[in-house]
Each structure stands twice: as C-alpha cells, then as structure tokens.
Amino acid sequence: MVEAPNSPSAQGPAPLVPPASVYTVAVRALCEFTAKRGDLDLRFTPSPTGAEGVEGHGVVTARRGVGYQTEVALSGDWGPLRVRGRADGWDPVARRLEEIKTYRGDLAHQPNNHRQLHWAQARVYGALICRQLGLQQVALALVYYNIDTRQETVFSETGEAAALQAFFEEQCWRFAAWSAQETAHRAARD
C-alpha cells in the first residue's frame, strides 16, 4: 500500500507541545474543527433551545427498547491526543450507535455541512466503541428529532472498524497538526 505523504499514517502523530503531556479534546470540538466545510456558521435556524434539546433526547431514548444505553462515555488516544465524549445512545443487541439531533422546521433545508459534522461525530464515536468493545463493525445512525412534530428521521450506515479507525486518526491528525502550529505561533508571539 502506498501512502500519501500528508496522510496521518505517513506523517505519524503531529507533535503537540510539550510532547510528554496529554491534550484532551471533546468529540464534538474535534469534529467541529476537522469536519467544517463551506459556511462556518453551524446554526440551523430556528433551532431548539437547550432545554428543548434535552427534552427531545429524552423522548427519543425513551422510545428505545430494554437494554438501550444513553450517554455512553467513550474515549480513545492518538499520540498525545485524548479524545472523549458521550455517545447519545447505544443498542448493544443491534450494535447500533445513535447520534441524536433535535431540530425544528424542514430537515430538507438543513445545510449539508451540518450533516457532515453530525456524521463525523457518529463515525468518531463508532471508532471509539469498536475499539472499546472489540467490534469489527457497528451500525451508525443519525436520529433527527423534530421538536414540533415529535417525529424522528433516521439516516443509517454500517461502519467497518478499520475504516472508522482510519477516519478517527485522520481527524486527530488534522487537529494535532493545527494544535502544534498554534502552539508554535503563540510561543513565538509571547
């Protein structure tokens, strides 16, 4: 296999300063940084309030079967980077990880960069859960819950552990490369 010179596996982990420390980043923050495409405004208006979002998550998870787990803590390391977060939902029987998003209005009007961000989050969580549980593949689902109509719209895909791990490493490499550059810039400035 020939690797591109700028790929994470060809370059190895980008150094963070200081190299002995661990830099912790949330899954959402990692993906917001690495998965941005197009317009940087990630608002989809009119958006639900924080309380409505929490309530919507509760409605969706209450609809799931026995054994369904919510707010599943996941973490994984890549070089000096520790990525962690809480997956919205996990069905261990179906091996299905859900990323739940609340919205109002017409989902067809949601900007594409939002969906890319949401898939990035689901795929990073998918990589982490495959690693944690030793799975070869996992079902991933974006569950969009309309606050006003109380309806769910679900988009699904199957993620192979190796592909999800490669995606995870790519996001980490991008973030770590930026972080090293930012640290060097701040050191030179100060």
Model-derived features with residue positions:
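Charge-dense, low-complexity intrinsically disordered segments
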Residues: 47, 112, 158, 162
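Metal-dependent nuclease catalytic cores in nucleic-acid-processing enzymes
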Residues: 58-64, 113-142
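Conserved catalytic cores of phosphodiester-cleaving nucleases, focusing on short active-site segments
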Residues: 85-111, 125
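Short beta-strand segments enriched in hydrophobic/aromatic residues
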Residues: 74, 129, 144-146
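Short, solvent-exposed loop/turn segments that connect beta-strands within catalytic domains
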Residues: 78-80, 110, 133-134, 150
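ATP-dependent helicase/translocase motor core
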Residues: 102, 134-190
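Metal-dependent nuclease catalytic cores that hydrolyze phosphodiester bonds in DNA/RNA
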Residues: 1-95, 120
